[in-house]
């Protein structure tokens, strides 16, 4: 579960989203909660923390980075989450995840919109987004099942490792894009 958490947290950090900060802070505080005597007493599980980070980051990544949605439109969903849990003991990762999934549908963000955005997007002007997308695509593992169908999964460790190098100039977009000889 740690690679999944770090993958989505890196996506959040690379894209410099501001709206999830308070939600992530609260979720991490609940995960790191201790009893009065100092012994660990997490209010949410590691899986719950990962689910919150994943759902909020994917919402921002799909809505703001890919669709180009306005930050002012995104904040209302984070406000809804904040109001729901203000003064309460712990967050509900399933409820939070469903809020962001519903928000994407409400904002018209679906698979066809994402494909259309990718076709028309100038990734050279959006270096960090291009690097994130290519890192995720490169980390997809496709397996053929016995019944002839295929299944896909994201290799979180690989994605996390690739995303770690976005700021250190180890790779350039030109290294990741297919090259056509002249």
Residue ranges with predicted function:
Residues 164-182:
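Histidine-centered nuclease catalytic patch
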Residues 38-45, 159-162, 182:
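Short helix/strand-bridging catalytic loops that position acidic/His residues to coordinate divalent metals
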Residues 135-163:
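Short, contiguous, well-ordered secondary-structure segments
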Residues 7-14, 158-163, 167:
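Generic recognition of flexible, low-complexity loop/linker segments
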Residues 1-146:
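A cross-family structural signal marking well-folded subdomains
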């Amino acid at each position: 579960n740690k690679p999944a958490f770090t993958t989505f947290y890196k996506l959040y950090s690379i894209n410099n989203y501001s709206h999830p900060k308070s939600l992530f802070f609260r979720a991490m505080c609940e995960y790191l909660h201790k009893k009065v005597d100092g012994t660990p007493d997490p209010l949410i599980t590691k899986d719950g923390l990962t689910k919150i980070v994943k759902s909020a980051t994917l919402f921002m990544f799909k809505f703001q980075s890919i669709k180009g949605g306005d930050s002012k439109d995104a904040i209302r969903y984070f406000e809804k989450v904040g109001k729901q849990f203000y003064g309460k003991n712990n967050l509900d990762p399933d409820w939070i995840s469903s809020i962001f999934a519903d928000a994407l549908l409400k904002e018209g963000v679906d698979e066809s919109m994402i494909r259309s955005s990718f076709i028309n997007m100038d990734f050279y002007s959006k270096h960090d987004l291009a690097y994130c997308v290519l890192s995720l695509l490169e980390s997809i593992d496709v397996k053929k099942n016995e019944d002839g169908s295929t299944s896909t999964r994201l290799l979180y460790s690989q994605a996390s490792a690739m995303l770690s190098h976005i700021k250190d100039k180890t790779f350039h977009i030109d290294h990741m894009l297919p090259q056509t000889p002249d």
